[in-house]
Curated annotation (Swiss-Prot):
It is found in: Nucleus. This is Transcriptional regulator of the unfolded protein response hacA. One of its GO terms (molecular function) is DNA-binding transcription factor activity, RNA polymerase II-specific. Belongs to the bZIP family. Master transcriptional regulator of the unfolded protein response (UPR) that recognizes and binds to the UPR element (UPRE) in the promoter of UPR-regulated genes. Exposure to antifungals and ER-stressing agents initiates the activation of hacA which occurs when a 20 nucleotide fragment is removed from part of the exon-2 and part of intron-2, which in turn promotes the arisen of the DNA binding site motif and a dimer interface domain.
Length: 384
């Protein structure tokens, strides 16, 4: 009994377990379609209940507008003190907002001025650019025109070289003059054969200009006429010359400085550089007359025999007479002044154009010397 029961149970378990080679069937209906929802269970007559939604985020506080007036701070906190209470923090916030507004206003003003400056520079540069473009177009047109004229002139020059007597040579010269006047009308002359012809005519006329001088001492008139054919213009110049003017016309500035009397037509004989006449040397009689002109009587030469008395000197001071002999061979200040006066008199009486001083030893005798050269050579101061 027991074995039969165990065999039936084993058979039933084997029939229920799937075979290892059998495939699992696939589902043809979605599980979501078979799931019941809460809305489907509620009857149609009853109102639907809204489900609660999650809480929304708190909106961010927007920035206040610039035109909004700030409240007056309730506290008066010093600048360097730390804010602790809410009123003090509000005061710091208001001060910060005011500083930011002022800085923003300054920044906007600076940007506005900079933009205006850049716009002005832009307008100025645009105007300059337009002007330069117009100038460039004008210069290009002028350059093209001149290039055409140069090419035409080159062809005419080649033609004139091949045929010198043809009318093309004359037109080439005219074209050369016109181009020269066009390129530099105020700085360069007209390069034409007429210019060189005029220069040759002027050189020829210079040699043929007459200069006539009458022997009469009165002023004479010499008329010089020079006629040039440059651009059909004739010039006539009249010059009044005198013998004195002709003499001084070729004088150098140094000659005029040395002869002031001749320049002002004074009645003093004029001596040219090649007509200098030196007077003969002065004799002893002339020297005696010149030196003794101020004295009423001849000099007293008795001290040469009797000697010089020292009693005449105050306190017997021999300082000024520190010499061994009675002859002073060196010139003193009085002698130099007298020599200068004598030289001036000689120049005024003779009329030298240049002052040439004579040797000092031959003009003035020293102290104690004879005027008639009767002493020995060692004593006479005037001996050479």
């Amino acid at each position: 009994m027991t074995e039969s029961t165990f065999a039936v149970e084993t058979f039933s378990m084997d029939s229920m377990s799937p075979s290892p080679g059998a495939e699992i069937p696939r589902l043809t209906v979605s599980p979501a379609d078979t799931t019941l929802k809460f809305e489907d269970l509620v009857p149609e007559g009853l109102p639907k209940v809204d489900t609660p939604k999650p809480a929304e985020k708190k909106p961010v506080k927007k920035r206040k507008s610039w035109g909004q007036e700030l409240p007056t701070p309730k506290t008066n906190l010093p600048p360097r003190k730390r804010a602790k209470t809410e009123d003090e923090k509000e005061q710091r916030r208001i001060e910060r907002v005011l500083r930011n507004r002022a800085a923003a206003q300054i920044s906007r003003e600076r940007k506005r001025l900079e933009i205006e400056k850049l716009e002005g520079e832009k307008l100025k540069i645009e105007q300059q650019n337009e002007f330069l473009l117009r100038r460039l177009s004008q210069m290009e047109a002028e350059n093209n025109r001149l290039s055409q004229q140069v090419a035409k002139l080159a062809s005419e020059i080649q033609t004139s070289k091949s045929n010198p007597g043809s009318p093309a040579s004359a037109s080439a010269s005219a074209s050369t003059s016109s181009i020269s006047a066009t390129l530099a009308p105020s700085t360069s002359p007209t390069l034409a054969p007429v210019l060189f012809k005029q220069e040759n005519d002027l050189l020829d006329n210079i040699d043929s200009i007459p200069f006539t001088i009458n022997p009469d001492p009165s002023t004479t008139t010499t008329t010089t006429t020079t006629t040039t054919t440059s651009n059909n213009i004739s010039s006539t110049s009249s010059t009044t010359l005198s013998p004195a003017d002709l003499d001084h016309s070729s004088a150098t500035p140094s000659d005029l400085a040395q002869h002031p009397a001749a320049v002002f037509h004074l009645n003093i004989p004029l001596l040219r550089e090649h007509d200098h006449v030196h007077p003969p040397p002065l004799s002893d009689a002339d020297l005696s007359r010149l030196f003794d002109a101020d004295s009423s009587s001849e000099p007293d030469l008795s001290f040469l025999e009797d000697g010089f008395s020292l009693e005449l000197l105050p306190d017997s001071d021999l300082g000024p007479f520190a010499f061994d002999s009675l002859v002073d061979l060196g010139p003193d200040e009085d002698n130099q002044q007298q020599q200068q006066q004598l030289q001036q008199k000689l120049d005024d009486s003779i009329g030298f154009p240049e002052q040439t001083p004579l040797p000092a030893s031959g003009l003035q005798p020293s102290f104690g010397a004879s005027l008639e050269r009767c002493d020995e050579q060692g004593i006479a101061a005037g001996a050479q």
